[in-house]
Amino acid sequence: MSDKNTNQNVSVCASHEVKIDNFSRTTLSVDSKFLEYMSNNWGAVPSEPATVHEVAPYAAARRAKVSRKFAAKRLVIAAGIMKQRANDTFYMFRPHTSFTHLTGWGANAAPGAVLVFDPVASCAISEDTATTADDVAGAAAQCDSMQHTVTLYFAESATRYSKEFFDNSEVGEFWIGAKPSLKQVSTALGLNCKPIAEFQSTADDVTLDNAALAEFLDELRLVKDDYEIAQMQLAVNATGRGFDEVINNLDSAVTAERGERVVEVMFHKHARTAGNWEGYDTIAAAGAHACTLHWITNDGPVKEGELLLLDAGVEVESLYTADITRTVPISGRFNEIQKKVYETVLEAADAAHKVARPGIKFHEVHDAAMAVIAEKVKQWGFLPDNPDPELPYHRRYMVHGTCHHLGIDVHDCAQARREMYYNAILEPGMVFTIEPGLYFHPGDLTVPEEFWGIGVRIEDDIVVTEDGSRNLSAHIPRTVAEVEAWVQSGRK
């Protein structure tokens, strides 16, 4: 899947990618009388009282783990900056994933914000300054909780009583509206907050460009806490309602020249009203386009008798996203070949679900799905005669993996080590997708022509529990009967 612009790994102390000068277009008077006039005669505007956000204790626990791991190191976690689209227009800002995970600040995070871990002096001992390994261990024992003071730096919006209110399009409330103050954010997130102007970088700062830090922060997200799982269930539920919107308006897609675009827009409308945005670019692939794994052009027709593969997810305000795929018969009923392929993919998905539990390795979930795919295409006679058993010929029809971790990023924890991801032992709290598929491209001479142009994927979001796993998206129609009834109901 293709993620939207995420503003990752950028310099600190800036909110925009480039400096924009609009002097050639227009300018305001700098006359003192005008400035005085603009800065006076404003009445008080009531604001919502700040309250502690439910994420605060969870984010604090995450920061404590980071602090213990990087004792004596000054860590600088930047939110990132707005990315330029053209001239003085910018993409919607999305903070760096690790910044959001450690602060709890999601969709309304301030561009240019910086989270800083300053070592506590009494804990400032490391391998470089210690004489023995016991020195390091002893210091850690003395500083069993936080070994840093943590400060969140960001620029408040400029109020009506400053020149920047109307003269600065980056922070002026005349331009961007009122934003939470330092005090409000401090109360909500349980963090010490200071103006970004007070932030000073040092030569020893460890930033997100540091491979060890980036790796640790990604691995920190491998097991989700209760808050995260609840947010992901919200995202999945919102996504399910978005799929309902698409199904209920499928007629408008069928009658449009670019019906896939209608499907995409229908889901986007729901994502923006029910959440923050989509978690990644929507794949609305009808007919043979479903055989293109990351089809995001979405400019084709939606025709009766074909299948529609919809791969989409709502990102909620906390920035956690769902990642769901359903493949539906546009006419409301699968033909025999479509049904044959669909039921095979469903069987593969169910086989993967069945083995997902604590104690097995992550890749064993994938292996269970692939075993079904391999056996079915062999039974259908699609594989070479006497194939080399060591070669996965069946992967011609499903080249992607079955599972990936899910969270704030659609492909979460991507910088985790292989032994912590692909070869990891499943633990309660891990959240990942199960998404087997089969794709038979037009012109594939290894399969009968009646299979050409059929692409099917079924994707659900799974959380590992103490004694097994739970399908967060089980309520979204999956079986042949459920899917057919779903489409038929929507197209009445």
Predicted feature residues:
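Active-site neighborhoods and metal-handling regions in enzymes and metal-associated proteins
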Residues: 1-492
